[in-house]
Design a protein with these regions (language model features):
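Long, positively charged amphipathic alpha-helical accessory segments at protein N-termini or as interdomain linkers
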Residues: 1-3, 67-69, 75-94, 104-250
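N-terminal lobe of the biotin/lipoate ligase/transferase fold
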Residues: 1-90, 110, 117, 159, ...
Length: 250
């Protein structure tokens, strides 16, 4: 089946667009993009809170009912957001940080949270959630518990949220289509934008253990392949922390 048309469902306020999409999965059409002006309980990966003040950023979740490799859904979501940012601010220096964040230098601009929807027969769909910092002011960015940036902080100007949400919908249609038609091509493009390849980074395991490692490769299933003290190891979960010593500008 071809990728569906992306249709936006606009909400004024919601606890979390991902939660709304999951709770209403059965009645929402494939390709519905749930958008909210604000979230009262925005969520990121590993239970992190996503700062979600009203009218400043993109908060949205895409309903994906056509299933391929679930990991590739994350790749499609990351590439759509990256394409939005690169088209809007070509000199922003944006790249993908494994597994799915979008960074500019050592500062996070967007987080993506993909969650499976399951029933008695198995996985019935995926909800891909997006938080993209657009017009967040520096004083708000300073309150976040990790270095962060917005399009406004990077460029010094404000952006039309409605226009950018429409552009995001276009990019999602493009990459949802690629996800369905050619997952291998999708993965190759996603991997090419992971600028941590070949660099030393700090890998943080789910239990909090931090390791300084050399990134050697990313496997086709999304596992990060790193070298530590001459030994290759593979990780399918955890996070990569970028410090001031980690520079990935183009």
């Amino acid at each position: 089946m071809p990728a569906p048309k992306i249709n936006c469902l606009n909400l004024e306020s919601v606890d979390s667009t991902n939660t709304y999409a999951k709770n209403n999965f059965d009645v929402l059409a494939d390709g519905t993009l749930v958008c909210a002006e604000m979230q009262t309980a925005g969520r990121g990966r590993q239970g992190r809170r996503w700062v979600s003040p009203p009218g400043t950023n993109i908060y949205a979740s895409l309903v994906m009912k056509q299933i391929r490799n679930p990991f590739y859904a994350t790749a499609a979501a990351s590439l759509a957001v990256l394409a939005l940012l690169l088209e809007t601010l070509p000199r922003g220096g944006f790249f993908i940080k494994w597994p799915n964040d979008i960074y500019a230098g050592a500062k996070k601009v967007s987080g993506i949270l993909c969650e499976a929807v399951s029933d008695s027969r198995g996985i019935s769909g995926i909800i891909a959630g997006f938080g993209v910092n657009i017009n967040l002011e520096q004083q708000e960015l300073d309150k976040i518990d990790q270095p962060a940036a917005s399009l406004k902080s990077l460029s010094g100007k404000s952006f039309d949220l409605g226009k950018l949400t429409g552009l995001l919908a276009d990019k999602l249609a493009e990459y949802y289509g690629l996800y369905l038609a050619s997952p291998e091509k999708l993965f190759a493009e996603w991997k090419s934008h992971n600028r941590i390849l070949g660099h030393q980074v700090t890998l943080i395991e789910p239990d909090g253990t931090a390791r300084r490692v050399q990134v050697r490769d990313i496997a086709g299933n999304g596992e990060l392949i790193v070298e530590e003290n001459g030994t290759l190891r593979r990780f399918n979960c955890g996070d990569v922390s970028l410090g001031k010593e980690d520079r990935f500008e183009s």
